[in-house]
A protein has these predicted regions:
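Feature marking well-ordered beta-strand scaffolds used for ligand recognition
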Residues: 1-199
Length: 199
């Protein structure tokens, strides 16, 4: 099990669920955070932290855990630094793209947007692929995306069948976009939310 901590991530062996034990930790990239999100793709963990300056995305090769019998403090495999504070990271396993959302102001301005797109087909060598944002949304009119799902559409609409579609929560609206071509992202629609808030 991968468990987010204030100061990093712990790796817990749950082979025997009655007697789980911590085999090691990966320290945080920066400072303590109450919010840490972890997703897994191709035997790699992708770790982000909210409200933490310059945390970025820590990438950890989980195969390093194999055969470990004593508590170990691990080092990251790679640090993706084109974002800073990130609320959540969504991964479309069918396409090999990650979407960093809920990006805080600590992010490098040229990469700041609603959903920051990262090509993770080679997990230990991620590359920036684009920015999705609808500036008619977000409480500051900046296209902020708090959470999202990114899927291959296989529904009844033939115009979008087989395309990679983003469904995003943008504070003031719910957004739908075609993110198939990372160099030509297309807003499809939005549904405005009145009296929005966080609970």
């Amino acid at each position: 099990a991968l468990v987010g901590l204030l100061l990093g991530v712990s790796f817990v062996d749950v082979t025997d669920p009655i007697n789980p034990f911590v085999i090691g930790v990966l320290p945080t990239e920066t400072v303590s955070s109450l919010w840490r999100d972890i997703k897994v793709y191709k035997d790699h963990a992708f770790i982000v932290a909210d409200n933490v300056y310059n945390h970025g995305v820590q990438i950890f090769d989980l195969t390093q855990l194999r055969g470990v019998t004593e508590f170990t403090v691990f080092e990251k495999t790679y640090h993706y630094d084109k974002v800073g504070s990130v609320h959540n990271i969504a991964i479309n396993e069918e396409t090999g793209y990650a979407y960093a959302v809920g990006i805080g102001s600590a992010s490098q301005s040229e990469y700041m947007c609603g959903a920051h797109i990262i090509d993770i087909n080679d997990p230990s060598n991620p590359t920036y692929s684009g920015c999705l944002g609808d500036e008619s949304t977000g409480r500051y009119g900046d296209g902020y995306v708090h959470d999202g799902q990114f899927v291959i559409y296989r529904g009844p609409d033939s115009d979008y069948y087989g395309k990679e579609i983003a469904f995003t929560s943008n504070e003031t609206a719910l957004g739908i976009a075609d993110v198939t071509d990372k160099s030509n992202l297309k807003i499809i629609s939005k549904f405005d939310q009145l009296n929005f808030g966080y609970v």
